[in-house]
Swiss-Prot record:
GO biological process: chromatin organization
Protein name per Swiss-Prot or TrEMBL: RCC1 domain-containing protein 1
Modified residues ((3R)-3-hydroxyarginine): 144
SUPFAM superfamilies, alphabetized: RCC1/BLIP-II (SSF50985)
Subunit (UniProt): Found in a complex with KDM8. Interacts (via N-terminus) with KDM8 (via N-terminus).
RCC1 repeat ranges, renumbered to this chain: 6-57, 179-230, 232-289, 319-372
Role, per record: Plays a role in transcriptional repression of satellite repeats, possibly by regulating H3K36 methylation levels in centromeric regions together with KDM8. Possibly together with KDM8, is involved in proper mitotic spindle organization and chromosome segregation. Plays a role in regulating alpha-tubulin deacetylation and cytoskeletal microtubule stability, thereby promoting cell migration and TGF-beta-induced epithelial to mesenchymal transition (EMT), potentially through the inhibition of KDM8.
Organism: Mus musculus
Gene3D superfamilies the UniProt entry points to: Regulator of chromosome condensation 1/beta-lactamase-inhibitor protein II (2.130.10.30)
Compartment annotation: Chromosome
Alphabetized UniProt keyword annotations: Chromatin regulator, Chromosome, Hydroxylation, Repeat
C-alpha cells in the first residue's frame, strides 16, 4: 500500500490587515512561502484585498483580516471587498447562494439569497473530503448565471454558452465554455478583453484569436487575462504595467515609487505609453498587449493551473512547480524579496523542500498555494 502523502496550504504577500498568511508573525508582508497559521483541514481559499476566507473539509468557512466570523455548511466561497458569497447547505438537499457584506461577519441576514434546484452541484462540490479544491463561484452551479459585486448581484448567462468556468477581473469577465472556447466582455481600455482593441464589450464576445484551440482554464487579473490550453500552453494579454504578462515593461527598469503605488493608468497616460511603444524606433517595453500572446515557461514546462492577482500572475506546471511574475512589492511572488519581475521565475521554496504544488489562488496582493510531499517511489 502506497504511503500517504501529506499536504498543506502556504501563503505569501500582503497581510497588512492581519489576514491568515503564513505564520502570522509579519505585520505587513510575507516575502517567502510559509505554512498557513490556520486549521489543518483547509481545503479551499478565497482572498479579497483586506481579508481571506478559508473553508475546511467539514464545510466551515472562517474569515480573517479586516473582518472575522465563521459559518458552517459551506460548499463554496468567493471573497471580494464588496461582497462575500457563500454556497451553503440549508438542511436536507436544500442549497442556497448567500451574498453578504464582508463586514457583517456572517451575522444577521445576507444582502441577497437565491435558492438552488435540489441536487445542483458545482465542479468539485461532490468531493468534500478532498484536501484541496477550486470552487466555481462566482459562477452559480446551474451555470446559467453568475454573481457580481454590485446590484443586482446576479447576472444571467445565455444557456447556449454551456459555461464551464467564469472569472471576474476588476472591470471585465472571462468565460470558458464546454467546447473550450473563451469569451470576454466588460471594460477593455487596458486590452484585457483580448479582441485587439481597447473598446468595451457589453455582451460576451468570442476571442477569435484563439479559435481552433481548445482551452482548459481561464484566469482574470485586475486588468489582465490568462488562459491555458488543453495541451498546457499559456496565452496572456491585457495590461503589462508591472510585467504581469511576462513581457518587457518600463517599470522593470525604472525605480519610481509612484508607479509601485499606482493601481491603474488614466486614459491619457495609457495613450502616451501606447504612442511610445508604437513609434518608429523599436520599443523597449510593452504597456498593453490587446490580443492573446503565447508565453513559454522555462524548460518548456506545460501549465495546468493559473491564477492572477491585481498585477501578478501565478502558474502551476504539470510536474508541480510554481512560477510567478509581475508586481512583487509585498512579496506576493514568493521569491524572498519585493522585486517585480517581467519574466516567469520558479518559486524555489517548494523545489528545495521537495514539495509538489497542486493548487494556487491569488488575492489582489497575495498568493496562496497548496503543496504536498513529492512521491519518493
Amino acid at each position: 500500500m502506497a504511503e500517504k502523502r501529506h499536504g498543506a496550504w502556504f501563503g505569501f504577500g500582503f497581510c497588512g490587515f492581519g489576514q491568515a498568511l503564513g505564520s502570522g508573525n509579519s505585520h505587513h508582508s510575507v516575502y517567502s512561502p510559509e505554512p498557513l497559521h490556520a486549521s489543518d483541514d483547509i481545503c479551499q481559499v478565497s482572498a479579497g484585498w483586506s481579508y481571506t476566507a478559508l473553508v475546511t473539509r467539514g464545510g466551515r468557512v472562517e474569515l480573517s483580516g479586516s473582518v472575522s466570523g465563521a459559518a458552517d455548511g459551506c460548499r463554496d466561497v468567493w471573497a471580494s471587498e464588496e461582497l462575500l458569497v457563500l454556497l451553503r447547505n440549508k438542511g436536507g438537499s436544500s442549497t442556497e447562494v448567500q451574498a453578504w457584506v464582508p463586514g457583517s461577519a456572517l451575522q444577521g441576514e445576507p444582502l441577497w439569497v437565491q435558492n438552488l434546484v435540489s441536487g445542483a452541484k458545482g465542479q468539485g462540490e461532490d468531493e468534500p473530503s478532498r484536501e484541496s479544491r477550486m470552487g466555481t463561484l462566482p459562477l452559480l452551479p446551474c451555470a446559467r448565471a453568475y454573481v457580481t459585486p454590485e446590484p443586482p448581484f446576479c447576472q444571467p448567462l445565455a444557456p447556449e454558452l454551456r459555461v464551464r468556468q467564469l472569472e471576474l477581473g476588476a472591470e471585465h469577465v472571462l468565460l470558458l465554455c464546454a467546447a473550450g472556447q473563451v469569451f470576454s466582455w466588460g471594460a477593455g481600455r487596458h486590452g484585457q478583453l483580448g479582441h485587439g482593441t481597447l473598446e468595451a464589450e457589453l455582451e460576451p464576445r468570442l476571442l477569435e484569436a484563439l479559435q481552433g484551440l481548445r482551452m482548459a482554464k481561464v484566469a482574470a487579473g485586475g486588468w489582465h487575462s490568462v488562459c491555458l490550453s488543453e495541451t498546457g500552453d499559456i496565452y496572456i494579454w491585457g495590461w503589462n504595467e508591472s510585467g504581469q504578462l511576462a513581457l518587457p515593461t518600463r517599470s522593470g527598469t525604472e525605480n519610481k515609487a509612484e508607479r509601485e503605488e499606482a493601481t491603474e493608468l488614466n486614459e491619457d497616460g495609457l495613450k502616451e505609453e501606447l504612442a511610445v511603444a508604437d513609434a518608429g524606433a523599436p520599443a523597449h517595453f510593452i504597456a498593453i498587449q490587446p490580443f492573446p500572446a503565447l508565453l513559454d515557461l522555462p524548460l518548456g514546462s506545460d501549465a495546468v493551473m493559473a491564477s492572477c492577482g491585481s498585477r501578478h500572475t501565478a502558474v502551476v506546471t504539470r510536474t508541480g512547480e510554481l512560477y510567478t511574475w509581475g508586481w512583487g512589492k509585498y512579496g506576493q511572488l514568493g521569491h524572498k524579496d519585493s522585486t517585480s519581475l517581467d519574466r516567469p521565475c520558479c518559486v524555489e521554496y517548494f523545489v528545495e523542500r521537495q514539495l509538489e504544488v497542486r493548487a494556487v489562488t491569488c488575492g489582489p496582493w497575495n498568493t496562496y498555494v497548496y503543496a504536498m510531499e513529492r512521491d519518493k517511489s
